[in-house]
Amino acid sequence: KSLLLSTFESLFKYGLRDFHGLEIESLWKDENTYQVIRLDFSNLKDFSSVEEFSELLDQYLLDTLTVNRLVSPIKTDKEGLRAFIGWLALQADNSVVLLLDEYDTPLTSCLNKPELFDEVRKKLWRLYAGFKQWDGAIRFFFMTGIAKFSQTSIFSELNHFTDISLMSEFGSLLGYSHQEVQKYFSGYLEQASFQLGIEKEKLLEELTLNYDGFCFERTATQRVFSPWSLLKFLNFPSNGFDNYWYESGGQPGVLLEYLKSHSTLKPEEYESEKQVQLDDLALSAKFSLLEDKVLLAQTGYLTIKAVRGTTVTLGYPNREVSVSMARLYAEVILDKKAINRAGEGYLADYLERGDLRAFVEEVNRIILGIDYQAFPLTSEASCRSALSIMVSSSSALITARSEVHNAHGRSDLEIQTDKNYWVLEFKFCREHDSQESLLQEAVRQMKTRHYGKQLAKCNLIRAAMVFSQKDRQFTRWAEVSG
């Protein structure tokens, strides 16, 4: 989004100066240049009171006017907001281009503080009302953000906005399509293929698995790569398919704080199918009614998978994001000290080495760090989900899938590493159940339903595991052969 604003800034400020030989050269018809004001509200997030926010906003707007040589650098006696609106009021018709990046950062910074949210909203209302009052001076206004909040008034004051967020015409605007990747990055793909020692087709498969899959439009037919992650990979292919999600701003701390009190971050929700109404994605929401699934879609953790009528199915776009989401879940079910001690990275090593005992013992050690009051493991499903989160967060090179179907049934958890393919079957032992009987039942189920046999070309490891509700540990396990 920020790169798009940079493109607009150059076009309106300098015309085609920076775009000779590019497709826009034949499409851009405006021969005039304009005073371009670019506001980046991602700078307005470090505050704990409305007074601190007001001071931040006023100083930022004054600095913007000063940097653009629109007011004297000598301190004005006006607050920054009044000075900015006053300047806009003096401009000629259609002479100003306003670009507002991350408009909602001040609001998302206080998602978990409703009273502060409301005070910040009122302060921003004055700015947006000024835009509306003097919109005759504005030739073009483009705004980006994550969430849409109806009480901010930007969607009512500026009610002549065209919201392109879910329009199919703009579905590939903020990402690279497969065709674009193969057309414009062919040389980079060949270099990466050579450095990694894999065929170009295999390289594209891995890139798709890791960085593709984002869908931003209501027909659910266009999918694009994350530009940041793809470009980082192409710059340093020797690093392999690293996870760049957090580098692209994919883990705002306030999101974590907000979601801690919502059901979406219960372990059993990690792999569940999530559905929302199309209007929930398309329309602005009241703060008090903001749905956590919608927020996760707006922040990129979930993307549109399918649209049937007015119902939207959401899911993780790719491995990079599903791993990042697993880490977000791990942040919640384990406190930070527990994460630092838990050693999820060891899980990846044990899975790669095929060491079942070490794997189970490490899982049990991590379980000790889970807050039982907040996240009790009370069923086979919750155990499966917790283990899936641990494994998925342990390495970007490991893929975990729950309830994988074959012709005879569905296994609990299947895990792909570089060398091994694990198939796990769980049983949940309540206080008066026989652990040994449950273990043998899981072994029989694994054998009679042939779990994993369709993957005979892989180094297959199959294991049955019993979780004791009383001990809160996996107390029985066995590798299944034959």
PLM segments and residue spans:
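Feature representing long, continuous alpha-helical segments
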Residues: A381, S385, I389, Y421-L424, ...
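Short secondary-structure junctions
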Residues: V391-T399, L455-C458
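Mg2+/Mn2+-dependent nuclease catalytic core
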Residues: F117-K122, F428-G452
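Conserved catalytic cores of phosphodiester-cleaving nucleases, focusing on short active-site segments
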Residues: L387, S411-I415, K419-H432, R449
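Active-site metal-binding core of divalent-cation-utilizing nuclease and nuclease-like domains
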Residues: L88-A92, A396-K419
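Structural motif
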Residues: V97, N420-W422, I461
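Phosphate-binding site recognition
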Residues: K1-S379, S394-L397
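Nucleic-acid nuclease catalytic cores
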Residues: L438-V443, H450-A478
